[in-house]
A protein has these predicted regions:
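Short, exposed beta-strand-loop hairpins at the edges of beta-sheets
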Residues: 108-126, 130-133
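Mature extracytoplasmic domains of secretory-pathway proteins
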Residues: 50-93
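Positively charged n-region of N-terminal signal peptides that target proteins for export
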Residues: 2-9
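Envelope-exposed proteins and targeting segments
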Residues: 40, 47-49, 72-76, 88, ...
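Short Fe-S-cluster ligation motifs
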Residues: 92-111
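C-terminal motif of bacterial Sec signal peptides marking the signal peptidase cleavage site
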Residues: 17-20
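Post-signal peptide N-terminal segment of mature Sec-exported envelope proteins
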Residues: 28-49
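Bacterial signal peptide processing site
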Residues: 22-25
Length: 135
């Protein structure tokens, strides 16, 4: 009887410990490109910031299988969470890909994939933002 109770207790402890464990947050390197899906975030080594790709707020880029007068623009929304708290939201543009300054770092949009096609509409979860954080 005591052995069975001990076994159940050990199993219960193992379940609690495993439930408390969470996968390690991915870490991006300063001055190197990293790719995020909508909703994903990463901490950036050598800084006190976490960058989260909120999503694409609008994509008016000219589809690859269309003829357009203008190239258009896509707006990538990111959230920067310093370790001290208080998130700040920034909109990065594909047409004017200027980095934004957040305290002592710059966040730049390098690329937004996939490129739109008229024949293949892009779903919000399909986007991948390639970003870079520099000093």
């Amino acid at each position: 009887m005591m052995v069975v109770m001990m076994r159940h207790l050990l199993i219960a402890i193992a379940v609690v410990v495993c439930a408390a464990c969470s996968p390690a947050s991915p870490t991006a390197r300063l001055n190197e490109n990293f790719v995020l899906s909508p909703g994903e975030s990463t901490s950036v080594s050598g800084t006190n910031v976490i960058v989260r790709f909120v999503g694409v707020q609008g994509d008016s880029r000219c589809p690859a299988d269309a003829v357009c007068i203008q190239g258009g623009d896509a707006i990538v929304r990111v959230e920067v969470l310093p370790s001290t708290g208080g998130a700040t939201t920034y909109d990065l543009h594909t047409a004017n890909s200027q980095p934004v300054r957040h305290v002592d770092v710059f966040i730049a949009l390098v690329e937004l994939a996939p490129y739109p096609f008229v024949s293949r509409p892009t779903q919000p979860g399909d986007y991948r933002a390639t970003l870079r954080v520099t000093r």
